[in-house]
Amino acid sequence: MRVDIVELLTMDKVTVIGLGYVGLPLSLTALSAGFEVFGLDVRADYIEKVKRGDVQMAETQGGRSIQDILVEAVESGRYHPTTKPDEALGYDNQQIILTVGIPLRDGKADPSMLNSALETLGARLRKGALVVARSTLVVGYTRGFIAPKLQNMSGMSPTDDFDLAFSSERMAEGSAFDELVGMVTPVAGLTPRATSRSARFLERLGIKSVIQASCPEAVETAKVFENIARDVNIALANEYANFCTAFGLDTKEVLELVRTHKRVGFLHHPGPGVGGHCLPQAMHYLKPPAEEAGVGLPVIETSRQVNCNQPIHIARLTLDWLKDAGRQKGKVAILGLAMKDYSTDARWSPAVDIARYLKAHHGGELAVWDDNVDREHVNLDLDYADTLESAVAGASAIIVGARQSPLVTGSVNDVSLLDGMDKPALIVDTRFAFDRKSVLERGVDYRAL
C-alpha cells in the first residue's frame, strides 16, 4: 500500500470512536484544525446530549465552555456526532482515532468495550486507512490485540493494507484542549510508514511536539509508567500525611519543609486516595505482561493498596474522633464528591468511597455537597445538600473530599462558614482547602490528610 504525500495532506475527514472525556475534546480539537469530524459512540442518549451541548465536562478553550463549543460545532455542519457506524466510517482515506477505554472488572482489565469497537471498525475498514489508538492500553495490546482483531474482521493486513499506531494521550481533565495540543506526544506504528504517517496526522491536529518512538510497546509502557509514577508518589505522600496526623504534626508544614530540599521538591500532595479512570487502573495494564514475564511489582502493588485504603482510613479516623468526643451520632458532611478538585467526574472517586463507608458504618446523619458532579453518576443514595452552608449546618465533622467553588483554590478565607457547625467539631481536610490556624481559632479541630 502506498499513500501519496499530497493525497495524505489533503485528507480532511476524521472519525473519533468514543466520545468520552478524551474523545469529545479531541474530536473538537480535530474540528478546529480544519477536519470534518465524525464522532461515533454507542450511547444514543449521550449522543443527543452532545448534539445539544449538554455534557457534564468542565473544559474551556479561549474562555469558552465546551458546551458552547459543541453547539457551534454541530451548527457548522462539519461535526457529526452519531451512533451509526456506516455514517461515521463511510468514506475513503479513513483516518480513525480510537478512544475507547479498558475498564476493570473484578480487578482485571476488561477489553470487551474495545473489542466491540474493533468489531464495528474492522467490518468497515477500508484499504489505506490510518488507525491511531489513543486510550491507555494494556502493554502489548496494539500489536497483540488490536492488530489481529482488525485483521480478522477486515481481511486486510495491518502492515500492508492499512496503518496502525498507538499514541498516548497525556491530557488532564479540566485542561484537555490545551494539553491535547501542548503536551509532547509520543507515537509509534507497527511499521516505519505507520509511525511517520501517524506523526504527520497528529501534527495536522495541531499537536506542537510529536515524538516518533521505536515501537508501540515502548509508547504503551511509557504511558502506563507515567500513571503509575503518580500513583506511587501519591501513596508516599499519603503515608507521610498519615504519620504526621498520628503524631499531631501539621502535615502541610512538614511537606513544605521537605520541598525546600532541591532534590525532593517534586513531592506530591497527599489526599483522600486516587480517583478517576487513569491512575487507579494503570497497575492493572502492566500486571498481565509482567506476570507473563515473571516480573514482580511489589512497590507498585503496595502503593496501589495504600491509595485504595486511604478512603477507609479517613472514614475511620472521623468515626474514631466522633466516638472519642462522645458524638457517635453526630452529623458528618462530605464537601466535594469528584475524583479530583474542580472536576465533574466521580469515577473511582475516593470521596465517594468515603461516603459509601460512612453510609454503612455511621449511625448518624450523613450529608454531601457537590455542585459539579452529576448525582446519577455517583450511584449512591445520599442526602445531597443544596448549598455548602446547609451541608455544614449542624455538622460535628466535615470531610473535604474535593475542592469545588466556593471551596476555592488555596485556603478558604471566610471561615465563618464553620460557625454553623455543632461543636466540638472536626475538619478532615484532604485537599488543604482550609487554613489550619484559622480553623483552630474558630474552635474546630483540624486534621490534614
Which stretches of residues belong to each language-model region?
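Structural/interface elements that position substrates and couple domains in central-metabolism enzymes
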Residues: 2-449
